[in-house]
């Protein structure tokens, strides 16, 4: 019997009585929704079932439950059941109750920030920007929603380079009496100062519209024909404009994964589950172009089948779905989801099973991606047994849900960085990683650096407090950590390599003076080594990145005639020092403030390692 089950033994008997009472009031073979209530009527969980009686019986068998489900069931004092006319009605009611009640143990996957759109605003000179929010009348033309925010950013950047569309606010646009630096960098045609007519600007907007509606091939042919026509007429300057637009279109195609012959907007959604965890992979097409894919994870063993998880996902996440969504589930359940969505939305969405070769291909791709993503996530996860063993080893009252790992990196005190890596039962939580640029320690004192990092982390107000802290360090780090963590009551340990600094000889130092050694091949030791190594990797990467930025900037500092303003203009124009190094002389001379002569000097210095006289 697990530690958790022992602690909850009395509560589980109360929960079993609540389940039994609910079962006695439910007829057989009916669909519906059930609410698990805790103390003071607090709603803990909302679920739905095609067969309510069969579903509730599953809460009798405590031996088959995960620790997460046991913890939830252990707080049940009452079950409230609502019988519905159909499974579709149950699915819709479940989604509405979850949205309204926000139960503690339900997985709510909705992104309150909304998915990003590409917006061409309603204006005589429309601007192109990334937009999040509801589509409203008078806003302009929205393209999307798209899954990948990064790809949207890259596509907008490429479209601006291709068609010189503005991105500034209307207030900034109205206040200009001369072009800004975006015009100098050829990202904008400066309509604010009428450098382009409204008619010509509208043509550029129309070309961007073609790209965003999947008509890139048609546009490419038009641009190529125009380029050849200008070239035949010896108008090489105009031909170069169309050449640059063709190159920008190619860069957009590099951003997207692949294209399809389908002209409609569609998503392909596949699900894969293992060990009580599910991954839903969404591949999104807009105008026949794929703008990326996104995995969604659900850690919830309450669901009876993958189809149930899929139904929950559709109603919680899809606030604005495309016209077609292809899923890999039974066609009967597609009808259930369709019926629920029709009542939820004001427009029709088709939930379909794949039939054509192309549809099946993209669903298989989504399925394979879901399998890879879930297997990768499960490899990173800590098994409950490992966390229970960690709690027992270091005297924690419960298995830790949040572990923070700290490490420093520097070379002789230069470019010092401290880092925080976060992990728990769900694996490595990379979005919560943090870097600390050391500010007060100048002599490479590792103990003082660790003190600064911990002090800065725990001096701030944070809703996330770790259950356990692991420090990559030895006995000497104990005093630095006690000064910060001692009064807070946060348990910690320092993990040091052995005398020969070999893996497998690690030692744990505790604040009470104890020293612990583990079996080098034990699962707990392998887990501790994995999270320690992740912190070490992150620290080294942060240090190297800082060092490389400094060294790269120093390269331009030594070129006569290149001061801070020109250095900044070069890096802004080309995106990085590497971009400057790859540039030709004629490209460098296009940067505002860089003459042909200075461009030649910069090019020669970067290529040969010396400035020309």
Swiss-Prot record:
Task: Tell me which InterPro entries the record gives.
Answer: GIY-YIG_endonuc, GIY-YIG_endonuc_sf, GIY-YIG_UvrC_Cho, Hlx-hairpin-Hlx_DNA-bd_motif, RuvA_2-like, UVR_dom, UVR_dom_sf, UvrABC_protein_C
User: In terms of one coarse class, where is the protein primarily found?
Assistant: cytoplasm
Q: Short name of one Pfam family for this protein?
A: HHH_5
PROSITE patterns found in the cross-reference section:
GIY_YIG, UVR, UVRC
Q: Where in the cell is it found?
A: Cytoplasm
Q: Residue ranges of the UVR domain?
A: 217-252
Question: In which domain of life is the source organism classified?
Answer: Bacteria
- This protein's UniProt keywords: Cytoplasm, DNA damage, DNA excision, DNA repair, Excision nuclease, SOS response
In Gene Ontology terms, what is a biological process of this protein?
Answer: SOS response
Q: What does this protein do?
A: The UvrABC repair system catalyzes the recognition and processing of DNA lesions. UvrC both incises the 5' and 3' sides of the lesion. The N-terminal half is responsible for the 3' incision and the C-terminal half is responsible for the 5' incision.
According to UniProt, the name of this protein is UvrABC system protein C
Q: Which organism is it from?
A: Anaplasma marginale (strain St. Maries)
Q: Give the gene symbol.
A: uvrC
């Amino acid at each position: 019997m697990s530690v958790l089950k022992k602690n909850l033994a009395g509560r589980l008997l109360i929960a079993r009585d609540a389940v039994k009472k609910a079962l006695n009031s439910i007829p057989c073979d009916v669909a519906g929704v059930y609410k698990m209530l805790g103390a003071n009527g607090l709603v803990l969980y909302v679920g739905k079932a095609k067969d309510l009686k069969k579903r509730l019986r599953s809460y009798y068998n405590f031996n088959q439950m995960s620790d997460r489900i046991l913890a939830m069931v252990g707080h049940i004092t009452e079950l409230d059941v609502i019988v519905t006319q159909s499974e579709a009605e149950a699915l819709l009611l479940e989604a509405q109750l979850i949205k309204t009640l926000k139960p503690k143990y339900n997985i709510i996957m909705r992104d309150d920030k909304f998915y990003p759109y590409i917006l061409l605003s309603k204006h005589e000179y429309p601007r192109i920007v990334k937009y999040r929010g509801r589509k409203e009348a008078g806003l302009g033309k929205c393209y999307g929603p798209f899954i990948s925010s990064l790809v949207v950013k890259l596509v907008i950047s490429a479209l601006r380079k291709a068609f010189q569309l503005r991105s500034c606010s209307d207030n900034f646009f109205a206040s200009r009496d001369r072009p800004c630096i975006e015009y100098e960098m050829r990202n904008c045609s400066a309509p604010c100062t009428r450098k382009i007519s409204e008619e010509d600007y509208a043509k550029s907007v129309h070309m961007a519209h073609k790209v965003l509606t999947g008509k890139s091939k048609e546009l490419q042919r038009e641009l190529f024909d125009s380029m050849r026509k200008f070239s035949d007429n010896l108008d090489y300057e105009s031909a170069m404009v169309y050449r640059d637009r063709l190159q920008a279109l190619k860069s957009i195609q590099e951003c997207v994964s692949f294209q399809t012959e389908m002209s409609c907007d569609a998503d392909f959604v596949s699900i894969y589950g293992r060990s009580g965890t599910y991954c839903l992979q969404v591949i999104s097409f807009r105008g026949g172009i794929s703008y990326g894919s996104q995995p969604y994870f659900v850690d919830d063993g309450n669901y009876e089948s993958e189809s149930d998880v899929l139904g929950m996902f559709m109603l919680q996440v899809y606030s604005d779905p495309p016209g077609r969504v292809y899923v890999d589930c039974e066609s009967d359940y597609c009808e259930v989801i369709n019926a629920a969505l029709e009542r939820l939305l004001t427009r029709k969405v088709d939930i379909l099973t794949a039939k054509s070769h192309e549809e099946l291909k993209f669903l298989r791709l989504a399925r394979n991606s879901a399998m890879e993503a879930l297997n990768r996530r499960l490899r990173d996860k800590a098994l409950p047994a490992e966390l229970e063993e960690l709690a027992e080893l270091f005297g924690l009252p419960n298995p830790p849900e949040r572990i923070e790992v700290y490490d420093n990196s520097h070379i002789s005190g230069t470019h010092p960085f401290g880092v925080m890596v976060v992990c728990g039962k769900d694996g490595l939580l990379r979005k919560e990683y943090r870097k600390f640029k050391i500010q007060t320690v100048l002599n490479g004192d590792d103990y003082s650096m660790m003190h600064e990092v911990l002090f800065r982390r725990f001096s701030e107000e944070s809703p996330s407090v770790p259950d356990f802290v692991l420090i990559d360090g030895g006995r000497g780090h104990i005093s630095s950590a006690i000064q910060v963590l001692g009064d807070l009551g946060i348990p910690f340990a320092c993990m040091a390599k052995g005398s020969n600094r070999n893996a497998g000889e690690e030692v744990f130092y505790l604040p009470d003076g104890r020293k612990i050694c583990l079996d080098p091949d034990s699962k707990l030791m392998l887990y501790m080594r994995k999270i320690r190594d992740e912190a070490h990797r992150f620290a080294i990467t942060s240090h190297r990145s800082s060092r490389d930025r400094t060294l790269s900037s120093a390269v331009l500092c030594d070129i006569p005639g290149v001061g801070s303003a020109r250095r900044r203009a070069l890096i802004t124009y080309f995106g990085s020092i590497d971009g400057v190094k790859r540039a030709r002389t004629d490209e460098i001379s296009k940067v505002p403030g860089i003459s042909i002569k200075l461009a030649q000097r910069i090019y020669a210095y970067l290529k040969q390692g010396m400035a020309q006289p």
